[in-house]
């Protein structure tokens, strides 16, 4: 037998991996300077003998210096200088520590290319002076300088100023040696003629017309005499400056409209610090229509446009050359404003063939005007076959409607655009016949649909063969959907072929084209559903009821080896048809595969007789939404007796990071939740939160769902634009929902967009508006929410990064779990 197979398999893969790791460390060690050790991200030089005399540099063609994030140097008495080019190669450097060494001098530009540097520790060195110019471009979190023999001079007064104005290095006891060689606390240091500079501009605001020129003057003062410079940011217009001691001027010529709203700053800087004064530049210019496109259909018809102008242009629409008087049926909507740019649309509510025609937009302000025209076609005239009669006039430009009210389609006898009365009569008869035929067809289709719904009742799990995995509706323990590579025929209609029971009626759900059926081969090969004896289940009381059946609190015996009995939640199956049983077993297999500390645990099934039973972990405190409301500022309104303790910020962060952990797991298993909300999370002992529900939430939280076409239920307040508009559900759409869950947590369970109707919510979300920051929410968490609510799915934050950020915030704020009593 060939020995070759012995070099394959997991064992050999691990061996090769170990060899590569050892090789990497060996290669790194060869590139290290003497007395130093290196890894791919770290350099440390702590051996005093023989020690180093210069800042450590890596050998060429060895470790990539850009990957080094930390350098530690200690006990190097012969290291005295950091030159300008010593650190420039370490562009990824975050932490620099040089302690108990001989460092005396740091070049001004030593850290010029180290923009990622956050922590510097120069404790117990030989520094006698250190300029703020070393660090002014860095966003440092820590600068530790204790134990250095600083000389009391104006050169170090900036450290005193820093202590007085910033958090770091205020915890340090810094001293300097005075002329008598005595240690003087830096906090008490007084140096004559050594203070902060000042900068003053003539005016805080500046308004100028496009194409003109302007000069901005600035005066500075201070002792030591400051240097004056201008910070113009990304100014587009041509500019030049002149400075002389305490005066400076900035000349801007041929000013561009692109510079409107920008800030220009005059900066004065000396040894002690800096001061600046800023002016806001406003540029006035004539309007231009930069974008006008054919109408698009969403929840309303929209003719999109973009207009630039300052002051804000007045907008006027014309329809077929006549002024269009706006009304509730047709009006201008501005969706996004960016100082001088306005993005919006002419919104039309259910336009007909009567609204077909030419639409002209005119934008006008005191500096000029601009206009553009677009032809719009919404639908053909009823009763006309354009394929057989292509020459028939599609758009009749006479005033069949009055522009003041697009909804008024009353014809006036003297305005009929035809001179042939007989032809007009024939067309009217044709229209009547068409309406009768259409009405008959619609009535027949409705009758067929009712019969199909009557005959095609599905199981409580809302699944049909391999096309569904775990139902999106309330009939399963968790509305999860698995992504796989099987085949399925997607349905794009409002009433998809699948039907699930919500409440007491069958409701069709939309089949999602992005996800396909899972095959048996994709289940884990070791999937084993635990079967529980019926005599081991003792019902205690009813917890609730959904369309699938009832949920009970129960005691289950012999389930865990370490406990004689435990409390569980059992879900019963009311429908005992063959299809329901097949779906029941399939869901049980899938739930068995979902094992995570923040997913409600599925114990197994009981199939001895009827009803069929699923056994789940019991979560003592119920769903998270009720829990949040019961522990919020309004709890006193709902509580009987003493109101519960209000949740703290740290406890809310603890809840949030647990939900994020569960979502990370679901994403790793290629599951999309599609209905993540606090109502679908459960709370147990010691503030333990898990994702999962028992199919009752849509009865209790019916106002959280929006009926589409009278049937389909969608949680639109938790859905991103692509899910609302295109029924597209992905891990990224779950990230959006997670952002809304964070908002729910920090508002103590308020309904998102509670002040708006469902239609208004759809409009807000599709137009790019987001929820406001809750009063109790830290800015870091709100920025995380905004990262979840990016319009483009690929720009949203990664679910793993969200979990890591929440974990770090939660660790920084210890949690006290006595809230549950």
Curated annotation (Swiss-Prot):
Site annotation (Interaction with SHC1) points to 515
Q: What is its main location?
A: membrane
PROSITE patterns tied to this protein: IG_LIKE, PROTEIN_KINASE_ATP, PROTEIN_KINASE_DOM, PROTEIN_KINASE_TYR, RECEPTOR_TYR_KIN_II
The chain positions of domain LRRNT read: 32-61
PTM remark: Phosphorylated. Undergoes ligand-mediated autophosphorylation that is required for interaction with SHC1 and PLCG1 and other downstream effectors. Some isoforms are not phosphorylated. Ubiquitinated. Undergoes polyubiquitination upon activation; regulated by NGFR. Ubiquitination regulates the internalization of the receptor.
Gene symbol? Answer: Ntrk2
- Write down the species: Rattus norvegicus (Rat)
Subcellular localization(s) per the UniProt record: Cell membrane; Endosome membrane; Early endosome membrane; Cell projection, Axon
Which residue ranges traverse the bilayer?
430-453
What name appears for this protein in its UniProt entry?
BDNF/NT-3 growth factors receptor
The tissues in which it is expressed are: Widely expressed in the central and peripheral nervous system. The different forms are differentially expressed in various cell types. Isoform T2 is primarily expressed in neurons.
């Amino acid at each position: 037998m060939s020995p070759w197979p012995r070099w394959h398999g997991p064992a050999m893969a691990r061996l090769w991996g170990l060899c590569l790791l050892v090789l990497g460390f060996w290669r790194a060690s060869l590139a290290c300077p003497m007395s130093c050790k290196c890894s791919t991200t770290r350099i440390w030089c702590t051996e005093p003998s023989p020690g180093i005399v210069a800042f450590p540099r890596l050998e060429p063609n060895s470790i990539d210096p850009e990957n080094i994030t930390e350098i530690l140097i200690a006990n190097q008495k012969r290291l005295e200088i950091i030159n300008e080019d010593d650190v420039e190669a370490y562009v990824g450097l975050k932490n620099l520590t040089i302690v108990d060494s001989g460092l005396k001098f740091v070049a001004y530009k030593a850290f010029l290319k180290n923009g990622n540097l956050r922590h510097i520790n120069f404790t117990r060195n030989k520094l006698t002076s250190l300029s703020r110019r070393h660090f002014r471009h860095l966003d440092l979190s820590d600068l530790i300088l204790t134990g250095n023999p600083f000389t009391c001079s104006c050169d170090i007064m900036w450290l005193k100023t820093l202590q007085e104005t910033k958090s770091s290095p205020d915890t340090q006891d810094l001293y300097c040696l005075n002329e008598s060689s005595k240690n003087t606390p830096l906090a008490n240091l007084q140096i004559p003629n050594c203070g902060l500079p000042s900068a003053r501009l003539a005016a805080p605001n500046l308004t100028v017309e496009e194409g003109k020129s302007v000069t901005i003057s600035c005066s500075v003062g201070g002792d030591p005499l400051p240097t004056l410079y201008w910070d113009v940011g990304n100014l587009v217009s041509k500019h030049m400056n002149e400075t002389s001691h305490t005066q400076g001027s900035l000349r801007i010529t041929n000013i561009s409209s692109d510079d409107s709203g920008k800030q220009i700053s005059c900066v004065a800087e000396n040894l002690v610090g800096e001061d600046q004064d800023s002016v806001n530049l406003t540029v006035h210019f004539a309007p231009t229509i930069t974008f006008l496109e054919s109408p698009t259909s969403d929840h309303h018809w929209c003719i999109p446009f973009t207009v630039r102008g300052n002051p804000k242009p007045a907008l006027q629409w014309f329809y077929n050359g006549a002024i269009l008087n706006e009304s509730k049926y047709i009006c201008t909507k501005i969706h996004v404003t960016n100082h001088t740019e306005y993005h919006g649309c002419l919104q039309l509510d259910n336009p007909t063939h009567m609204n077909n025609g030419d639409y002209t937009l005119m934008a006008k302000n005191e500096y000029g005007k601009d206009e553009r025209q677009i032809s719009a076609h919404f639908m053909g005239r009823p009763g006309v076959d354009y394929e057989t009669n292509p020459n028939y006039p599609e758009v009749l430009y006479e005033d069949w409607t009055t522009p003041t009210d697009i909804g008024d389609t009353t014809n006036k006898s003297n305005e009929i655009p035809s001179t042939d009365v007989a032809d007009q009569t024939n067309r009217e008869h044709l229209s009547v016949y068409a309406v009768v035929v259409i009405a008959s067809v619609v009535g027949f289709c409705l009758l067929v649909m009712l019969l199909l719904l009557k005959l095609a009742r599905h199981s409580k799990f809302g699944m049909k063969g391999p096309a569904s995995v775990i139902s999106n509706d309330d009939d399963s323990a968790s509305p999860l959907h698995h992504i796989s590579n099987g085949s399925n025929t997607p349905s794009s209609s409002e009433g998809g072929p699948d039907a699930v029971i919500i409440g007491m009626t069958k409701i069709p759900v939309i089949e999602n084209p992005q996800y396909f059926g899972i095959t048996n081969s994709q289940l884990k090969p070791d999937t084993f559903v635990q079967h529980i004896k019926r005599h081991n289940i003792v019902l205690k009381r009813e917890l609730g009821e959904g369309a699938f059946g009832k949920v009970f609190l129960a005691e289950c015996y012999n389930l865990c080896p370490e406990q004689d009995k435990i409390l569980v939640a059992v879900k019963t199956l009311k429908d005992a048809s063959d299809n329901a049983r097949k779906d029941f077993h399939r869901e049980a297999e899938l739930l068995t595969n979902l094992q995570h500390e923040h997913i409600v645990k599925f114990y197994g099934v009981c199939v001895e007789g009827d009803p069929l039973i699923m056994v789940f972990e019991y979560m003592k405190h119920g769903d998270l939404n009720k829990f949040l409301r019961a522990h919020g500022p309004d709890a006193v309104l709902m509580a009987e007796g003493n109101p519960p303790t209000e949740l703290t910020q740290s406890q809310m962060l603890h809840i949030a990071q647990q939900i994020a952990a569960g979502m990370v797991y679901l994403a790793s298993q290629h599951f999309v939740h599609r209905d993540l909300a606090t109502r679908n999370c459960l709370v147990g002992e010691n503030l333990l939160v898990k994702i999962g529900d028992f199919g009752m939430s849509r009865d209790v939280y019916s106002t959280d769902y929006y009926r589409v076409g009278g049937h389909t239920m969608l949680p639109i307040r938790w859905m991103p634009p692509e899910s609302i508009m295109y029924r597209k559900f992905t891990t990224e759409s779950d990230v959006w929902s997670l952002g809304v869950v964070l908002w729910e947590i920090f508002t103590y369970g308020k309904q998102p967009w509670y002040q708006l109707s469902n239609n208004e919510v759809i409009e807000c979300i599709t137009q790019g508006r987001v929820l406001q920051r809750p009063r109790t929410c830290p800015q870091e968490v709100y920025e995380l929410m905004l990262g979840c609510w990016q319009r483009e799915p690929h720009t949203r934050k990664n679910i793993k990064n969200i979990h890591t950020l929440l974990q770090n915030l939660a660790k920084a704020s210890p949690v006290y779990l006595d809230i549950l009593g």
